[in-house]
Amino acid sequence: MPKQIDHEKRRKQIAEATWRVILERGMEGASARNIAKEAGLSLGALRHYFSTQDELLAFAMKLVQEKVTDRIKDIAVRDLLPKEKVLQILLEMVPTNEETIREMEVWFAFTAYARHKKDMFDASHDGIFSGMRNLIAYLDESDLLKQNADKDIEAERLYALVDGLALHAMLDPVRVNKDRIKRVIMQHVESICVEDTRETQKRHP
């Protein structure tokens, strides 16, 4: 009896092979032939799962996004104080270990490539800015955001902070390490929030 292959699982394996090729050779080396070889498939077999190279690259890009989103969803349901929850979510969006640094390197390579292929994937609609707006709204709903804060501008500042930290953490992970990233994000969040009495009670029961 022929071995049945999980179609979606194989597509994800091919996407992960695409990441490895990009990390080793850059986007210019992410040809269908190189990806097929990395995935241990013939070119014809690769075409069975993805009819075009852009279809494969779009899927591989979205898979990176889904991995981060899944980790954020896991944090969102945890029983944490609001500022701590926001901090943990933001830390998931900045590379702080070998795995997430690789993901970020692939993501930046994809977004640079996708700038000229809006029909493939519009990086300006990657959900990150809307995520920042949701976090600012969450702080506001928790009565923590400073009263006169401009929520739209604060979302933009948070986006710029996370994006900049992500780039610098990828380029210089020794200097921009997890501890420094956490301190920068914590100080920024504290600067836009009022004191949380629940945190005070937790420190001084």
UniProtKB/Swiss-Prot annotation:
SS bond list: none
Keywords: DNA-binding, Repressor, Transcription, Transcription regulation
Alphabetical list of Pfam families matching this protein: TetR_C_6, TetR_N
One MF annotation (Gene Ontology) recorded for this entry: DNA-binding transcription factor activity
Residue ranges of every copy of the HTH tetR-type domain listed in the record: 8-68
Record feature DNA-binding region, as residue ranges: 31-50
GO BP annotations listed: regulation of DNA-templated transcription
Tree of life domain: Bacteria
UniProt-listed Gene3D superfamilies: Tetracycline Repressor, domain 2
Role of this protein: Transcriptional regulation of the polyketide synthase operon.
Protein name: HTH-type transcriptional regulator PksA
Species of origin: Bacillus subtilis (strain 168)
Gene encoding the protein: pksA
